[in-house]
Amino acid sequence: FSSIPFLYYFLPAVLAVYFLTPRKGKNAVLLLASLIFYGWGELRLLPLMVFTIGLCYVCGLGIERSRNRKKLWLLTSIVISVGLLGVFKYADFFIGSLNAVTGLKIPLLHLALPVGISFYTFQCLSYTIDVYRGSVPAQKSLINFGAYVALFPQLIAGPIVRYADIARELEHREHSWDNAAAGLRRFLVGLGKKVILADNFALLIRLFRQSGETSVLFYWMYAVAFALNIYFDFSGYSDMAIGLGRVLGFHFVENFNYPYLSGSVTEFWRRWHISLGSWFRDYVYIPMGGSRVSRWRWVLNILTVWMLTGLWHGAAWNFVLWGLLFAGLLLAEKWIPALQRLPGVLRHGYVLLAVVLSFVLFNADSLAQAGQDFAGLFGFGGLSLTSAETLYYLKSYAVLFVLGILGSTPVVKNAARRMDGTKAGAVLEAAAMLALLIVCTAYLVDGSFSPFLYFRF
């Protein structure tokens, strides 16, 4: 997405062909463009995605047309789809863990992780489950279904789009200049988040890892920088995906709603990666009984869902612990009413501290590194509070931190909204979007390519 070839060659060519193609052929154009887009970076793993599309398409039809074998068709789609995800993403993790516990020496498979497999697998699963539940009819057109699963704006890193949310638009979507303009604005805002904010925070994170400089302040700068980096990186991709979807006539679900304004961890997860949280709620948590079970069964449901949420993000123990950490925090908020009675400022501060520290665990390459990072944050091992080099980096990145903090709130959005409908507002918006495109292009031409963090999931 955030590359010169995509912005100035692939995207204009696809949009030109798409809008010149008659309505009946538009989904075929999208499917072909999406397969080219995926094959551009993962050609040898493209057949895996095509197979998953074909599998869930056939299973969806089987579920709808069969009276006695609906569950068999559903289980087939779930077992094979989850099996493929498990083999490619988790096989080495489980083999390595088994070897460590038992002393065995089972060789690792070293399989390449297909880009976006967690996202398109969850989309396919939600489709077959919804067809089984009778929530949606099966899609009869393989081209339409393939376009839904492989749709290039959100294929790689979400949001996780459910078939039910865009079923009508797959066949009867509307296009307009207003939709296209709104979509392009959203796309450019997302591009700016990624290129100007996320990538520059990534530079500071790289400096922290490579400089060898250790002080308590530098560890905290790193922790806050990564929390802002992952937010702008992931929400930037979501903005770009939602914006491009709007240009093409689709209305994807929102994926972020200023999560760092949350007053509780529960609220944070209603605002962060919304499509993933709702997916686990509707397809795992509620089918397990949700909160309508005994207290200890409910606790087990919470622990299971959040362990799976952690594993969804990556095949490593730090992700498992990251998920269980949030499970513990959510349970604490339910069991300790005093947390909700704290003054708003204290509740907000506790959530920010918990989230920032959780992302230190999330970003660690190993549990050993996580332990080292936490020790540094709290000054263990005789670390100095600060140093001349740390203060230099703080001054150098102070403006970026201010922009990042402001950008994680609706301050800019609210200011722009107050100027909606005015001539000055229209001129300023157009100038701002043009300037944003120019600045982002300059960054992309001058710098090295920095992939989105969630591509690896």
Per-region residue spans from a language model:
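Membrane-embedded transmembrane alpha-helical bundles that form the catalytic cores
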Residues: 1-456
